[in-house]
């Protein structure tokens, strides 16, 4: 049986969401958003910024910078 492997993007966003790590999201327009990742799917990210939710399309994101490092741990070892 094949195990579904999460991609790096999903691991990164899920860790930021679970640990409520504040992130800065840079958009392709140069605009900068700060907040907490509340959820995500294949095409979008929900960011909570100052109590307001924003639906951001991933194709508009250039960079996501966490406030503190996100550790990547292989849970299968």
From Swiss-Prot:
PROSITE patterns on file: SM (PS52002)
One of the protein's GO biological processes: regulation of RNA stability
Domain called Sm: residue spans: 10-70
Pfam families per record: Hfq
Transferase listed as a keyword: no
An example molecular function term from Gene Ontology annotations: RNA binding
Keywords: RNA-binding, Stress response
Cited SUPFAM superfamilies: Sm-like ribonucleoproteins
UniProt cross-references to CDD domains, sorted A to Z: Hfq
Record's keyword annotation contains RNA-binding: yes
Intrachain disulfide bonds: none
GO cellular component: cytosol
Function recorded in the entry: RNA chaperone that binds small regulatory RNA (sRNAs) and mRNAs to facilitate mRNA translational regulation in response to envelope stress, environmental stress and changes in metabolite concentrations. Also binds with high specificity to tRNAs.
Family named by the database record: Belongs to the Hfq family.
Subunit structure: Homohexamer.
Protein name, entry field: RNA-binding protein Hfq
């Amino acid at each position: 049986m094949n195990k579904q492997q999460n991609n790096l993007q999903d691991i990164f966003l899920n860790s930021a969401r679970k640990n409520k790590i504040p992130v800065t999201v840079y958009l392709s327009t140069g605009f900068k958003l700060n907040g907490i990742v509340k959820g995500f799917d294949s095409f979008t990210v929900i960011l909570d910024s100052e109590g307001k939710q924003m639906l951001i399309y991933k194709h508009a994101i250039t960079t996501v910078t966490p406030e503190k490092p996100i550790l990547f741990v292989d849970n299968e070892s």
